[in-house]
Amino acid sequence: MKDFENDLIYYPNPDPVKEPRFILKSVDELEKSTKYSVTCNGTERVVYHTDSFDYVVVVDNEAYDLEISIHTPYEKLEIRPSSFGIVPFVKGETVHIHLDEPRKFTVETDGGLHDALFVLCSHRIEKPADATICFEKGKVYNVGVLTLKSNDTVYIEEGAVVSGCVYADHCDNISIVGNGIINGACWHLPDSNADRFFIYAKWCNNVLLKGFTAVDGPSWHVVPAACDHVVIDDMNIMSRIVTGDGIDITSSQDVEVKNCFIRSTDDSICIKSQRLFEDPSTVRDVTKVRVHNNVIWNAEPGNAIELGYALQSEIHDLVFEDCDIIHCQYEGNMGGAAISIHQADGGHVHDIHYKNIRVEQAEQKLFDIKVLLCRYTEQLAKGEINDIYFDNIQVLNGDIPVSMIRGYQTPTEEVRVHDVHFDNITFMGNKCETWQDMRLVTELANDIYLNGARICRQMKF
């Protein structure tokens, strides 16, 4: 159910934060959870607290024997994603969980959306031999903005906290790896977004982001812009302010996103092609992107897996597969979809594949495909959307969400969405055989197929 009393506030012109608002003196200054405590393999782990979630980073190279103590009474316990098949043993206030391999999952009590525990397990990443910048365990580092150069390898050891943002511009062969934390809270007011990206690489080649946690950034969290050959692996990305996108793949090519946990207060994984900070060089095609094996929580607003709104160049040959969308919360505006394509500009969007995606809760929309004019539009002539493929998309529980496909029409222009293919769409185990089963609304669209049969064609007037 939507909790309007806890709505996030969007500041379209946030107060400028020109310098870090505070200096952390110790890792102990980060707020700790009073609701949860966690041990793994007999060792107590630090559980951090925010006003939107609690989280614990669990690093080990063995099997994981977890004891999660919940210090407040509750009636209903849920572990997500359900596809992991995690079966807890509950004794008193302690939840016992055994994992043979690292998993990233949530512990939720009584349907609470602002007090869940994120349990983020990973294998330990050792210090690379070629590390050029090292942040050590148990220490806090106030970097303001850490600017990388070519061939930099940043190592953030488990237990280290880096306070600030990380930027790279026209760099080759850069890496940020480790099991530590980058915290961006110093760059925004407590309840406001800010006009600054968190981890931002522009026109870089060969970029690796692996293992670390990025939490509470000032706006978009991980932004490869006009980059080539990017791997984002085993990251934990968590935001709590509006415009807190998870990953914005902007005008980049040959990108892989895998094994990540993303809880975002805007689009979780997003594809864009647009000018960034008025820089026209960041407009180019997006292609050869593969997103797989991620756990996604899309808090209001935004969408879970989004293409748009700014799609100013060609977007093609993208694959999204084997992901769990554990929450897609109600937005009530233009977003709120588990899977969306929003074309507000002129780029041609085609050959996009979605496969084996499980949706546990979609409060507003499942699919939302539109060509439109909106506040984000910069190119008036609109690009086409066609050859879009959905296969084995499962809604596992909750209400059955609506889906929408809509083209664009003015007195001088018509752009129809066409050749969209749905196969093996299921709601609570029941396969959709008709557009009515899918709760699908189409306008200005044609050649829409469900299980190989055309369910929407263009009428001749």
Predicted regions and their residues:
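Extracellular/periplasmic carbohydrate-active domains that bind, remodel
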Residues: M1-F461
